């Protein structure tokens, strides 16, 4: 019996020692003054760089009874950062087809804060898609800008916008003297109802959608798997983003891709480029730089290119452009 008791005691002691070691190994590491590097993965797969950026998912109060799910990306140090807002397209989300996280982290590494919201009915938004409207997105941009300037040491003077497709239209309609620079990827910037040509490629089809929405309050768009509201279509019909673009005096980067033809007309490309060329100042014109890219800036099938190559080019372009525009502007204040 004594041997049995001794064995039992030894086994008990051994278990206690092992448990203590396991508990110590599970303790979280002490906080460091420098955040751990982030290895970015985007549309092109694992990236070839590490970032010191701080990335957080937050829920921003719109002030209108709902939350705006957003991702913020901050520099690891400093203050009075310029701010960039990244605007996704129709039925998209704040990941921006995989492009926005890398753009945001590269900008943060250069000292620029970024925020990417999910617009109503998109991504993690709790709202129905029928709440997706131009006026709602304008208000959401105002809310996220105000939040960033209140919650973080963000400059009140220096603001950049990036917009893809419908996000490009939203960014363009937001242009005024407060916006330092804007980067537009394949903006859906045709005038009036031609602006929702991605819902119907014919004028007759667009008019039918508008009239049905006016009669029923909303209209289903089976090709996109969503129902849009009368408000959305009427606001599109009444808006003229190129008039706002023509009046804007700040730096602009513009890109279009060969694959845009599935969503946007040649008339849209011509109108936007003609508008920018009519201004008194030059712009970064990348309209012919993506013959191998889809509307979402991945490689077209049989193009001989790769998603990684297209992604690197479309993602790096606004980083250099916005860093030059925003950091120079920040230094002047």
Feature map (PLM): residue ranges:
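Glycine-rich nucleophile elbow surrounding the catalytic serine of serine-hydrolase chemistry
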Residues: 162-173
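Alpha/beta-hydrolase active-site loop
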Residues: 131-152
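The alpha/beta-hydrolase serine catalytic core
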Residues: 68, 169, 179-326
């Amino acid at each position: 019996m004594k041997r049995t008791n001794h064995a039992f005691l030894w086994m008990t002691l051994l278990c206690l020692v092992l448990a203590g070691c396991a508990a110590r190994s599970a303790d979280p590491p002490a906080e460091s003054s420098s955040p751990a590097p982030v290895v970015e993965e985007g549309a092109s797969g694992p990236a070839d760089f590490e970032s010191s950026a701080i990335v957080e998912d937050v829920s921003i109060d719109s002030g209108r009874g709902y939350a705006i799910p957003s991702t913020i990306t901050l520099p690891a140090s400093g203050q009075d950062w310029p701010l960039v807002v990244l605007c996704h397209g129709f039925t998209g989300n704040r990941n921006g087809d995989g492009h926005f996280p890398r753009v945001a982290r590269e900008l943060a590494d250069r000292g620029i804060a970024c925020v990417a919201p999910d617009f109503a009915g998109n991504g993690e938004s709790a709202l129905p898609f029928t709440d997706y409207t131009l006026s709602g997105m304008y208000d959401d941009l105002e809310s996220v800008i105000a939040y960033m300037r209140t919650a973080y040491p963000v400059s009140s003077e220096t603001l950049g916008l990036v917009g893809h497709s419908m996000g490009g239209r939203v960014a363009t309609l937001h242009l005024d003297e407060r916006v330092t620079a804007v980067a537009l990827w394949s903006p859906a910037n045709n005038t009036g109802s031609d602006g929702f040509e991605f819902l119907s490629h014919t004028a007759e089809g667009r008019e039918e959608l508008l009239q049905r929405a006016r009669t029923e309050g909303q209209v289903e768009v089976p090709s996109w798997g969503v129902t849009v509201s009368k408000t959305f279509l009427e606001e599109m019909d009444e808006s003229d983003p190129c008039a706002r673009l023509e009046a804007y005096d700040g730096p602009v980067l513009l890109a279009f891709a060969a694959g845009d033809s599935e969503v946007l007309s040649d008339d849209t490309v011509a109108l936007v480029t003609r508008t920018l060329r009519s201004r008194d100042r030059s712009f970064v014109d990348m309209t012919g730089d993506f013959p191998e890219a889809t509307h979402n800036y991945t490689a077209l099938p049989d193009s001989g290119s790769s998603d990684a190559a297209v992604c690197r080019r479309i993602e790096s372009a606004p980083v250099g452009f916005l860093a030059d525009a925003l950091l120079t502007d920040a230094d002047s204040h």
